Amino acid sequence: IPESLPPNAPLIFLMHGFTGSAAGMYNYSGMQSVADENGFAVCYPDGTIDQNGDRFWNVGYNFHQNQTVNDVSFLSTLASYLQNEFFLSPKNTFASGMSNGAEMSYMLACFAGDKFGAIAPVAGTMFGESWTDCSIEPIPILEIHGTNDNVTLWDGDLNDNYWGPYPGMDEVIEFWVGQNECENS
């Protein structure tokens, strides 16, 4: 946290992808210099290490069905702690991430929208309960996803036995259009 950060400064959670790390996200994103120049704080949390030694966010992948870690609770508690400890803005706390971190952003929007004011997922989709049980108040979202992504396919894959079935990005965007009561234009 920069020493010169004003009270009520924004806070951004920036989450790594599957097998990634907080340090890797810090180095990859270049976000810290942007935060320092623009007066906001960035939190680079580390996910849990799974049975294969890989870091992950628990978003409902098929091969993590035996995992019981509640990352929504962990990140919500961490947000409250950082807001209180460093006088950061509860109204301006946001979540973003890459791939599995993006999928965790969706989980936070669905199940901790009272702690996170907006999300900006990059190259991720909605899995498991974020897709089947998400019911929230409208929340701003900036979705970034390439059509040539060969890991999280643009068109989705309802037969994926590795990650688990997931919808295409058109369906995900339509879901958020409905959730946020947007008008098509």
Predicted regions and their residues:
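Short, flexible active-site-adjacent loop segments at beta-strand->alpha-helix junctions, enriched
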Residues: D46-T48, S99, T125, T147-N148
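A short loop-to-beta-strand scaffold at the N-terminal edge of the catalytic core in hydrolase folds
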Residues: I1-E3
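The feature captures the conserved acid-bearing segment of alpha/beta-hydrolase catalytic domains
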Residues: G117-S185
